[in-house]
UniProtKB/Swiss-Prot annotation:
Record: residues binding substrate: 289, 301, 400, 445
Record protein name field: Probable succinate dehydrogenase [ubiquinone] flavoprotein subunit, mitochondrial
Keywords, comma-separated and alphabetical: Electron transport, FAD, Flavoprotein, Membrane, Mitochondrion, Mitochondrion inner membrane, Oxidoreductase, Transit peptide, Transport, Tricarboxylic acid cycle
Predominant place of localization: mitochondrion
Similarity annotation: Belongs to the FAD-dependent oxidoreductase 2 family. FRD/SDH subfamily.
Pathway(s) of this molecule: Carbohydrate metabolism; tricarboxylic acid cycle; fumarate from succinate (eukaryal route): step 1/1
EC number: 1.3.5.1
Residues that hold FAD according to the record: 61-66, 84-99, 268, 434, 450-451
Molecular function per GO: electron transfer activity; flavin adenine dinucleotide binding; succinate dehydrogenase (quinone) activity
Gene Ontology BP terms: mitochondrial electron transport, succinate to ubiquinone; tricarboxylic acid cycle
Entry keyword Signal: no
Subunit structure: Component of complex II composed of four subunits: a flavoprotein (FP), an iron-sulfur protein (IP), and a cytochrome b composed of a large and a small subunit.
Protein purpose: Flavoprotein (FP) subunit of succinate dehydrogenase (SDH) that is involved in complex II of the mitochondrial electron transport chain and is responsible for transferring electrons from succinate to ubiquinone (coenzyme Q).
Amino acid sequence: MLRFRKVAPSLKNGGNLKLFSTSSTLKKIASSQPLRAKQVSTSESVKYPVIDHTYDAIVVGAGGAGLRATFGLAEAGFNTACITKLFPTRSHTVAAQGGINAALGNMTKDDWRWHFYDTVKGSDWLGDQDAIHYMTKEAPKAVLELEHFGVPFSRTKEGKIYQRAFGGQSLEYGKGGQAYRCAAVADRTGHSILHTLYGQSLKHNTNFFIEYFAMDLIMEGGECRGVIAMNLEDGSIHRFRAHKTILATGGYGRAYFSCTSAHTCTGDGNAMVSRAGLPLQDLEFVQFHPTGIYGAGCLITEGCRGEGGYLLNSKGERFMERYAPTAKDLASRDVVSRAMTVEIREGRGVGPEKDHCYLQLSHLPAEILKERLPGISETAAIFAGVDVTKEPIPVLPTVHYNMGGIPTRFTGEVLTIDENGKDKIVPGLYAAGEAACVSVHGGNRLGANSLLDIVVFGRACALHIKDTLEPNTPHKPLAADAGLDSLKFLDQIRTSQGPKHTSEIRLDMQKTMQRDVSVFRMEETLQEGVKNIARVDGTYKDIGIRDRGLIWNTDLVEALELRNLLTCAVQTANAALNRKESRGAHAREDYPERDDKNWIKHTLTWQHKTGDPVTLKYRAVTRTTMDENEVKPVPPFKRVY
């Protein structure tokens, strides 16, 4: 039998479990681990030291959304903890290259209402227009705030923030030509934003728990009371009690074989929500970025095309002129990815196997490449062996972003539905960033709206908590056995002796998703996909962990991450099979048209634990804005670029 024991910290620390709250900034940076737990000698056969922590608010994840929420809360006087499974500046936000959208009007006249229009159109009318209204209106303020925090934006000759062209962006509600709306730090925008936000978090009284793996939410009576996490350094278990919990854990790109995501993008927050009996939303909408390096999957930013690069087929033809006569290579990502796939299918691909396309940059002046795309020149040389001043880059559509995730309001509050199908807020639980589905991206995200999303909605979570909670509000006691199921599962999986290795099951899952739930989808392949991913999901019980230790057990962590990926993958395949239309990134060859009469609605999916069947329901898309006196809703029309 497993029982929780509170473990007393060393008396040298004065018995204070929240050591980081009194640590100097230097110690916060130097230490990745604020607590040292000692194993309790008990009669149980399995011994896990368990430590309880109490905070006003906790944030899981230290990417852009998590850090913006964290220091927003700390700045407002809340005792705040940030739990992250890796060092904050290794979070995947660091990989965002192109920029962040905001209607600053530094290059041409611009208006946030035009940005609103482009985002609704880009979402293929699956985006909630109240949330899009909020995001696009807040965008200029968010970017100027980042500038004040210290983000070193590239500059025009006049000293203004430099803005480049990006796909799907227009002026005057689509009638005024290409917009230059994407504020950039060369081609390393995410890197700069992440480091700046981390610096701001250290500046405020933030308590970091670095290299702690969040396993599950602690739920009581439908309310989120915190999370249970494992310290990867020593295997100790930590229960974090808080009035408010924010999940900012990123996407689940690693469910696919070829993706631009870091190996840490495993849908942890999504799966935690699913295991808590709550729904995930719109998982069928998986964005394929048009330009991942062929064979490596590394991202080549859309900024390349924004600076004047273009795609070529084997005939040397700029084929996007046929698919998007106006926007050409700067059409939305789903349009470009499908066009590339069609070119390859019809035999106009390049290379010995005619299975990819070329991105041409060599016509651009060398000084432009050096100043505005320095990282791309380096990436292409390392991963494709290409000198971009002389040769094209071999590229292929690659899984890049999850439009779906944890359903939330624009305040960050997590939603479910009641027995009558009406929206219901989950008390104490918030989500932001790629883990969340607000939904501002709907069926397809516009490039450079993701960095905007994380900053705006990370901040929105902090603002809503500030408005609804007083710092140092007393806590209700936590049930003595809270999190016990998580600990039982951890013990079960750590000691599992099945015949299958984590990597074997993971590869099976990735190949299945890449083959059956890809750029183009059909009933037959999706049925196969649902059947195959259910089979893979069923093999998880056969997993075997070779390392029985608790200290830096990467085998165990990968097994836990695989469970999370499977939860996301199974629901993605089921949601895709059930949506009988083509919308945004969900392209059905057997249902090639968008069906606004039946399918302007969000998919909700439930799967309580690995191996369980998936339940599907639907909820309405918000088709009104926050204030029609500010901006009118955009009614659906045929989406062309």
